[in-house]
């Protein structure tokens, strides 16, 4: 009976939304760590924000953020995202960026890992020992949408971990030679030839890649939606502050 009770307590701890377990005000903490809400910066007002981890529409299937619904970034990183929005608007005023994830507290990262421990998603979630780019406010998950908020077809959904969601096939490195538009274009066109995504989805995905690279943000090879700076993680940890809350 004792073991059964302990098991129930453990399961409840895993399934309970993080915000229900803490009194932390994530918004206040983000500001304390000098991060900025992108929609409050000039040029970022019309970027749409729908944080997937503030819903159950994610691979975890749980609301991990609860009260956190704004997209926070390090100020210089936010300016690059806004630059991408400006580039996109210049190409097509009927389109906008739609942000799915931004800065993520390390406590949420660790909670995510506990939720997926022992599942098929375990390898896709860092354990939060040192933190990834989201945990430093220098990564963005996003797509392109119409001004009405309808996402364009990218050939695979957010948090899809199949080959259809990839943008590059070889082991990813942060050097310029391996992360350029030609490499990504050839790979994405190859997904069409393999029958994994449609031609229209490839065009949409390449538009996102082109816009983001022009703003000096680069996609992570396994996730078409994830963009980051061209810096090794060691340098990120050296220069940035971990969102240790």
Segments from the language model and where they lie:
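Aromatic-lined carbohydrate-binding/catalytic grooves of carbohydrate-active enzymes
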Residues: 109
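Conserved metal-phosphate-binding beta-hairpin within the catalytic cores
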Residues: 227
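Positively charged n-region of N-terminal signal peptides that target proteins for export
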Residues: 1-4
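Extracytoplasmic cell-surface/polysaccharide-interacting catalytic and binding patches
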Residues: 20-102, 112, 118-222, 230-245
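Bacterial N-terminal signal peptides
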Residues: 7-15
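Segments that shape or occlude catalytic/ligand-binding pockets
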Residues: 105
